[in-house]
């Protein structure tokens, strides 16, 4: 079929946009024709828009990697600037942090934080917990049956049955614990499992399906699955359960900044930083009723690293849960962050794309760790926490010194 006919039929809605790759067996050609269809469609006809005349690029991209994994109805790709902060010394290693952002001053500020941290010997960071969660809703005919199911899930015998079924779903998924809450005759069951180097949402969802099937075969035939996700997980929304129980990687990171580095590099004082952190990040956040937001701008750094490394950017909602603490220790500044729900992976999702894969490689965490599954994803979580630590340190320093507006005018505004 001639391209002109494909475009005409697509414009009229007789060929679905999503079917072009399958019909043409050529991802790049499908993207090119879809751009033409969008340009000639009545939805764009009255705004003088053409994809070919736009600044949205489409050539020179690996659409085979995108197909069936990352995006649908593709018409191009969105270039976002990528900068590097650092290198920063973390657990004895020097690492550059890639950050993809359009916010001027963010990379420069984080880089300044890295310099100050290195002056004190670097960051020490630990993974305190590692478990992705999924929480389905199941429904029973009566409250009594829901209560019996909750009790069974909490028993050793019940857990073993569920564990066997869950673990059989994957080489890497390993069930850690189950937490069930009954609301009337509905039961919300929060499964927590390790998922290797994958972020793990698909993996754990598959395991949960098999676990629920096993449950129905062991005395709970009347149980109906309302939804595989019941928001008790909780994914991509603020939730106290993630702050308290953790989700993904639970991480803490700490550094000591010598007084001279605070004064010379950060242009402030230890006393001013400690006071500002209490007034802003602790008291101010409490006044706001913040949930997981006891920090200055953790989400800025988390999202920038996520975009650069192929993570799910929507998961910055819970991944940015951060408590920032600053103390005066013998005249020097001790700064730490606690991040209970960093959700990252080094395989799957956007990590299959070439540019994102390259940034993971630069950080030394690309792909699956062949010797210790999960180690690369844990290392990435530590690097995210180190970046957040640097970002918190620098922004709070700018606020305490009154230089925030000046720095943004320097890096975020073009003259003329």
Swiss-Prot record:
The keyword Lipid metabolism applies. It is found in: Membrane. PANTHER family: 3-HYDROXY-3-METHYLGLUTARYL-COENZYME A REDUCTASE. GO terms for biological process: coenzyme A metabolic process; ergosterol biosynthetic process; isoprenoid biosynthetic process; secondary metabolic process. Keywords: Glycoprotein, Lipid biosynthesis, Lipid metabolism, Membrane, NADP, Oxidoreductase, Steroid biosynthesis, Steroid metabolism, Sterol biosynthesis, Sterol metabolism, Transmembrane, Transmembrane helix. The active site is at 103 (charge relay system), 236 (charge relay system), 312 (charge relay system), 408 (proton donor). Glycans are attached at residues 167, 277. It comes from Emericella nidulans (strain FGSC A4 / ATCC 38163 / CBS 112.46 / NRRL 194 / M139) (Aspergillus nidulans). One of its GO terms (molecular function) is hydroxymethylglutaryl-CoA reductase (NADPH) activity. The chain crosses the membrane at residues 380-400. This is 3-hydroxy-3-methylglutaryl coenzyme A reductase AN1593. GO terms for cellular component: endoplasmic reticulum membrane; peroxisomal membrane. 3-hydroxy-3-methylglutaryl coenzyme A reductase; part of the gene cluster that mediates the biosynthesis of the diterpene ent-pimara-8(14),15-diene (PD). Within the cluster, the HMG-CoA reductase AN1593 functions in the mevalonate pathway, which produces isoprenoid precursors. The geranylgeranyl pyrophosphate (GGPP) synthase AN1592 is needed in the formation of GGPP, the precursor for diterpenes. Lastly, the pimaradiene synthase pbcA performs the 2 cyclization steps that convert GGPP to ent-pimara-8(14),15-diene. Gene3D superfamilies: 3-hydroxy-3-methylglutaryl-coenzyme A Reductase, Chain A, domain 2, HMGR, N-terminal domain, Hydroxymethylglutaryl-CoA reductase, class I/II, NAD/NADP-binding domain. It is a single-pass membrane protein. Its EC number is 1.1.1.34.
């Amino acid at each position: 079929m001639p391209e002109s006919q494909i475009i005409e039929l697509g414009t009229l809605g007789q060929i679905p946009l999503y079917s072009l790759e399958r019909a043409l067996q050529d991802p790049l050609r499908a993207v090119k024709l879809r751009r033409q269809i969008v340009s000639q469609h009545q939805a764009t006809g009255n705004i003088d828009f053409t994809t070919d005349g736009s600044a949205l690029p489409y050539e020179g991209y690996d659409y085979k990697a995108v197909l069936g994994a990352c995006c649908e109805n593709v018409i191009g790709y969105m270039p976002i600037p990528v900068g590097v902060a650092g290198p920063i010394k973390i657990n004895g290693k020097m690492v550059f942090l890639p950050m993809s952002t359009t916010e001027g001053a963010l990379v420069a500020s984080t880089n300044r934080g890295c310099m100050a941290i290195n002056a004190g010997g670097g960051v020490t960071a630990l993974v305190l917990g590692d478990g992705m969660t999924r929480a389905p809703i199941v429904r029973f005919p009566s409250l009594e049956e829901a209560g019996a199911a909750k009790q069974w899930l909490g028993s050793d015998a019940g857990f073993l049955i569920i564990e066997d079924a869950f673990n059989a779903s994957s080489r890497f998924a390993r069930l850690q614990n189950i937490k069930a809450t009954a609301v009337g005759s509905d039961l919300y069951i929060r499964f927590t499992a390790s998922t290797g180097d994958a972020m793990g949402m698909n993996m754990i969802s598959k395991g949960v399906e098999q676990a629920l099937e096993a449950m129905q075969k062991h005395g709970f035939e009347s149980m109906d699955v309302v939804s595989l996700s019941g928001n008790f997980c909780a994914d991509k929304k603020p939730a106290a359960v993630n702050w308290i129980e953790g989700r993904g990687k639970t991480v803490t990171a700490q550094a000591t900044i010598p007084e001279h580095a605070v004064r010379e590099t950060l242009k402030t004082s230890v006393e001013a930083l400690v006071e500002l952190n209490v007034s802003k990040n602790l008291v101010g956040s409490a006044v706001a009723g913040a949930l997981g937001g006891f920090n200055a701008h953790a989400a800025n750094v988390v999202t920038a690293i996520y975009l650069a490394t192929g993570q799910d950017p929507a998961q910055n909602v819970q991944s940015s849960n951060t408590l920032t603490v600053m103390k005066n220790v013998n005249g020097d500044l001790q700064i730490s962050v606690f991040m209970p729900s960093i959700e990252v992976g080094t395989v799957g999702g956007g990590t299959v794309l070439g540019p994102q894969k390259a940034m993971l490689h630069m950080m030394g965490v690309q792909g699956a760790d062949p010797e210790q599954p999960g180690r690369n994803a844990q290392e990435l979580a530590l690097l995210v926490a180190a970046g957040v630590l640097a970002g918190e340190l620098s922004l709070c320093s700018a606020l305490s010194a009154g230089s925030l507006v000046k720095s943004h005018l320097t890096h975020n505004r073009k003259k003329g």
